[in-house]
Amino acid sequence: MDSERDVRAQLQRAGQDHLLRFYADLAPEARAALLAELASLEADALREHCQRAAAAGALAPGPLPDLAARLQPLPPERVGSAIRCDQETRLRWEEEGFRQISLNKVAVLLLAGGQGTRLGVTYPKGMYQVGLPSQKTLYQLQAERIRRVQQLADQRQGTHCTVPWYIMTSEFTLGPTIKFFKEHDFFHLDPTNVVLFEQRMLPAVTFEGKAILERKDKVAMAPDGNGGLYCALADHQILEDMKQRGVEFVHVYCVDNILVRLADPVFIGFCVLQGADCGAKVVEKAYPEEPVGVVCQVDGVPQVVEYSEISPEIAGQLGADGGLLYNAGNICNHFFTRGFLDVVTREFEPLLRLHVAMKKVPYVDEEGNLVKPLRPNGIKMEKFVFDVFQFAKNFVAFEVCREEEFSPLKNDDTADRDNPSTCRRALLAQHYRWALQAGARFLDVHGVQLTEQSGMLPNGDPPAICEISPLVSYSGEGLEMYLQGRQLQSPFILDEDQARLLRPQDC
């Protein structure tokens, strides 16, 4: 272990020796832990990180200069659509996706390094329940979608396939996530096919360029953003693991989208048939000022431009069809070939831009007292997963229906949008639509049949509560055999047990 003298000299070179100012107050165990943490922060890298953070924090936020002359929508030939395509084309994409899944060439990779702080909880977001009748968590919904898509591929191709699930966690979420999965028997997935790994952490920095102590014996650290994926892949030999399994295509997504379709065969098939090395699902922006990044081209290169970087004038520009010109909203749902990820980790990762996040970072003051600031006092530097789009040789975007595939969980219920209630309603509304399309009808509390025209209730809930397990249907398929011609009382849960009861005897 590095000595106090060595660590202090290292910190002095970095201009960060204040991190040891409470060393004399600490017990032996706390001293050892602090020295170990500080020794891992290499002096030159620490100095550069703190200087870059302070410099970036001093820049005025706002629209990028000269963006109007540099910005273009993606060329039409680079964009596919699950909404506007004909049925034959969609089936061709889906069939190719299922073929690749059946050949064990597809993996999913979950970005799960963030805590549920904005939700008012201290545990990982994936462990959160939004209040579904089944009380399923985000992790369970996602695990069951993996099981179902494997089952569908096997049924179509006559195989026994595996979709490995890679989960990138952080120092905050790794332990709780492992414990949660073990407690729930990995949701009946083979544990050898669930690979958890940890992203790097970076010190939070004051506006003056000083690393922050959150306790006398602990530096305030934060995950290096979802773009930390590329270092983490290299740190933990994840690409080597994928190669050994025969994985060629990776579906990367964020933990907080309750409607996410893991290993979506339509998306996978589209990207593969296009020969893409990198792809992004997008949804049409709801309105010009919607706070989502835009997938577009800057100087002829594909990338995501954050909503804060686009002026209102550009955001409101209309295209020839009368819709928004820059309407491809990014939803953190991406396709990569393993070969592309390998090149990124070896060559391009150091070129990724660092993004600034101003945060309220708890700290200890000069007397060693804990302070919880009421306004941002620190800078956390992050990399974004989508900043590799610029390095793709064949980038594509794939438009999907927001109501079917995107409802993120960002805030608690005091917020107007992206909260547990909006997520719950989005999923239940989807399942209600699926049930109607399968030929079911619902009864209200008085036993009166609801009409198909029955609108959403004043609170945003569907007219009847219906939840369909991902183990029964992945995207609305196969429900007719259970629901055709049936009258259902709300609330109705179609899980595997209920499906067995409703299944016709001759099936």
UniProtKB/Swiss-Prot annotation:
UTP binds at residues 111-114, 125, 199, 225, 256, 380. Coiled coil: none annotated. A motif (Substrate binding) lies at residues 111-114, 306-307. SUPFAM superfamilies: Nucleotide-diphospho-sugar transferases (SSF53448). Its EC number is 2.7.7.-. Pfam families: UDPGP. It comes from the Eukaryota. InterPro entries: Nucleotide-diphossugar_trans (IPR029044), UDP-sugar_pyrophosphorylase (IPR039741), UDPGP_fam (IPR002618). Substrate binds at residues 226, 410. Keywords: Nucleotidyltransferase, Transferase. One of its GO terms (molecular function) is uridylyltransferase activity. Belongs to the UDPGP type 1 family. PANTHER family: UDP- GLUCOSE PYROPHOSPHORYLASE, UDP-N-ACETYLHEXOSAMINE PYROPHOSPHORYLASE-LIKE PROTEIN 1. This is UDP-N-acetylhexosamine pyrophosphorylase-like protein 1. It comes from Mus musculus (Mouse). The gene is Uap1l1.
